[in-house]
Amino acid sequence: NLVDIPIPANDDAIKSIKLIVSKLSTGIQQGQSY
């Protein structure tokens, strides 16, 4: 199983991809600060 948590999104829309990557990177940065 390659996916732990599916994220429904329109992967053809650049704005959608930018939003998801932004949220993921923010979460990673916050997690690393602890």
Swiss-Prot record:
Keywords, in A-Z order: Chloroplast, Plastid, Ribonucleoprotein, Ribosomal protein
Any one GO molecular-function label of the UniProt entry: structural constituent of ribosome
Record InterPro entries: Ribosomal_uS2 (IPR001865), Ribosomal_uS2_flav_dom_sf (IPR023591)
Entry's localization field: Plastid, Chloroplast
Top-level taxon of the source organism: Eukaryota
GO cellular component annotations of the record: chloroplast; ribonucleoprotein complex; ribosome
UniProt-listed GO biological process terms: translation
Keyword Cytoplasm belongs to the record: no
Keyword Plastid: yes
Family recorded in the similarity comment: Belongs to the universal ribosomal protein uS2 family.
Protein name (record): Small ribosomal subunit protein uS2c
Gene: rps2
